[in-house]
Amino acid sequence: MKRTRGIDRREFLKFVGAAGALSLPVFRHSMGFAAQWPAKPIRLSIGYAVGGGTDIFCRGFAQAMEGPLRATIEAGNMPGSVAAIATDFVLKRPADGYSWLGTSNFNKFLRPMGYHKGVPWKDWQWFPVAGTYMGWGVKPDSPFKTFHDVLEATKKRPVTVSHSGVGGIWHEGDGILAKAAGVQFSYIPYKGGAPAVLAALQGEVEVASCGVHEQIEFLRAGKLRNLAVFENEPMTVEGMTFEPITKYVPQVKPYTPFSGDISIGVRREAPVEILKAIYQAYLKAYESPRYAEILKQNVGYKVISNPLESDKKAAFRECVTASIFKELGIAKIDPSELGLPRPEEFEKWWPPKDYKPRLT
């Protein structure tokens, strides 16, 4: 499946932000420090475990950027606290364009969960690299034949569900689902979607809740069975048809499609010439046939946005999640304490007085 997203009124009302496909002309400056950049390898610190969606797409996209940048990009994983550890590490590095962050959903979870005080749309220049789908999977011999069976089981006991971290994207989706269905799950957090899938395969939990891209190799091999995807219509991938969650919980329709974004972030204080060079390489990387194949193989889709769109999307995503987490009782910090409006008031609020675009 291919999908390209853009922020519009329909998705705003669904509390789901996205990015369009606009681009800005960018030219590399020939004078000053940026003219010699990059003069050494760039380090990409990925905030989730090896093998998960953030890892796969960030590594793949970084490889596609090496040619346009004429640089070597060295990727390493620093999982924990839904990328807060990697975020803190990169923010403490010099803002010289040599330290990048690989994360998901523009770090929208960190402030509402009290993991980090940094403001995503003030600290980072974001470069979205992929969009992903949410799904639930079980071992082939699981007694849960459909998602209806899971819901029925929760009437007797909380079903154990793995996800990529407390306060992360899949935890958010599970919270929305649980509240709409009036059930409770017993959540077991892991440091990424890949470990969350392995937990189900090894019998540590009953259901894996994560991205379809993190399940796909096991679905292909028949080692995992999909129960549903967070969509409003059936989804077909390589001849496999996945049922929409609305078939079992119609109340979540306003939140569909519920999905995640994978992004690379660069310190916003980096020289503008360097940020422009990175953005130019970003646009070129999306033309890579190799990266297109990575998207296809891992059930991802393109999410291209220009710098101004990315700033707005990062703020909107944080605003929506802070509101949802408060409603679900997950938030550690109230949205009002973060200076965030209610989602329905976002368009009037944006841009706030202290917002300063870095690239225009």
Q: PLM ranges: what are they?
A:
Residues M1-E11, F15-G20, F33:
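N-terminal secretory signal peptides
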Residues F33-K122, W170, V183-S209, F218, ...:
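N-terminal (or domain-start) structured segment
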Residues M65, F89-Y98, R111-P195, D261-I294:
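Hinge/capping helix and adjacent helix->loop/strand transition within the periplasmic-binding protein
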Residues Q215-E293, L338-T360:
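C-terminal lobe and pocket-closing loops
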Residues G265-I330:
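Secondary-structure end/capping motifs
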